[in-house]
Regions:
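The feature captures the beta-strand-to-loop junction immediately N-terminal to the Walker
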Residues: 39-41
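Helix-to-loop junction immediately C-terminal to a conserved catalytic motif
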Residues: 54
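Conserved ABC transporter NBD signature motif
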Residues: 62-73
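ABC ATPase NBD coupling module
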Residues: 71-88
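Conserved signature/switch motifs of ABC ATPase nucleotide-binding domains
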Residues: 84, 139, 160-161
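Short coil-to-helix segment of the ABC ATPase nucleotide-binding domain corresponding to the Q-loop/switch region
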Residues: 100-109
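Conserved ABC ATPase signature
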Residues: 140-144, 148-149
Length: 167
């Protein structure tokens, strides 16, 4: 099984009143096709690591590779495309856009890649049906239960056929 994400000496610090080092020289290889679980007490760096893996944040030091390509944090356009194409993210909070329906929340994530609204809508409807929401696709987040919102988030994370899902 090949490495998909490789972390080498990743550290992350936050500066508030004092320098808080959350991750210290983390080295790990994530393989394709495997399932990983992050566990630890509150404040131990789980969310920080997920934000680094999803390219939402950058490490204070260290090297991260996706495939064989080292992440260049100055190239935000490339990183945005990588995130959209290869990474599905299911947030702890649903992060749905409140002014858009369940269907729109899912297909908007695909539209930047697909460039065809009709195809994006068809894919989105299929995914929403798979997660049991075919009768709720035109409902807004405020009209959905917490579990339904989470299922919309799952469909949104899956819409671009990612190689990795971070949750």
């Amino acid at each position: 099984m090949s490495n998909f994400i490789k972390l080498s000496n990743i550290s992350k610090s936050f500066t508030r009143q004092k320098n808080l080092k959350v991750l210290k020289k983390l080295t790990y290889d994530f393989k394709l096709g495997k399932i990983y679980s992050l566990m630890g007490p509150s404040g131990s760096g789980k969310s920080t690591l997920l934000n680094l893996l999803s390219l939402i944040d950058r490490p204070s030091s260290g090297i991260m590779k996706y495939g064989n390509k080292q992440i260049d944090y100055k190239n935000s356009n490339y990183n945005d495309v990588l995130r959209a194409n290869k990474i599905g993210i299911i947030y702890q909070q649903d992060n749905l856009l409140p002014d858009f329906t369940a269907l729109e929340n899912v297909y908007l994530a695909n539209l930047a890649i697909e460039k065809n609204k009709e195809i994006s809508e068809i894919k989105s409807k299929k995914l929403l049906k798979k997660v049991g929401l075919s009768n709720r696709i035109y409902h807004y987040p405020s009209e959905l239960s917490g579990g339904e919102k989470q299922r919309v988030s799952i469909a949104r994370a899956l819409i671009n056929d990612p190689q990795v899902i971070l949750a």
